Amino acid sequence: KYNSSSSSSSSSSSSSSSSSSSSSSSSSSSSSSSDSYYDDSSSSSSSSSSSTGMIWPVGSSSITSYFGYRSSPTAGASSYHRGLDIGASAGSSIWAAASGTVITASYNSAMGNYIVISHGNGVCTVYEHCSALYVSVGQSVSQGETIAAVGSTGISTGAHLHFGVTVGGDYVNPLYYVSP
């Protein structure tokens, strides 16, 4: 469960715009105190939006691990996977699935470099294992804006994006919100 109250900032930003933006951010990585995945040249996504208005967050559609119970590739036992693992080349662009405000841009020993974006109405998206973060806490981002690069930081078996969605602090299946 992601606890947004552990973040240094939160937002009431409004939500899931379905129009893509081509703006790009070049700010350097920032950290919050919170500890609680192939289009390498593009600065914004051209993906179509789902019925929820969110877009797929990377150029690759290769889902390597689904939401829910699974045999863990790192723990050697069954575990509950709180998102989708999407295989992609290291350094590939990661795009904001919807417009919102960055509430966490940090490092965690399990998630590696990660970002949490609040989209309003209790909906947040989570992007883990990034090699680089291009946004900072409090920054407004547009749907399709490049926010990070795919990596393998934290507990990871290779380059991928772990993409999660929370509603009211509880993880839900991201495929309810996005489709490859």
Residue map of PLM features:
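Catalytic cores of peptidoglycan-degrading enzymes
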Residues: 52-180
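Alpha-helical oligomerization segments with coiled-coil/rod-like character
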Residues: 1-50
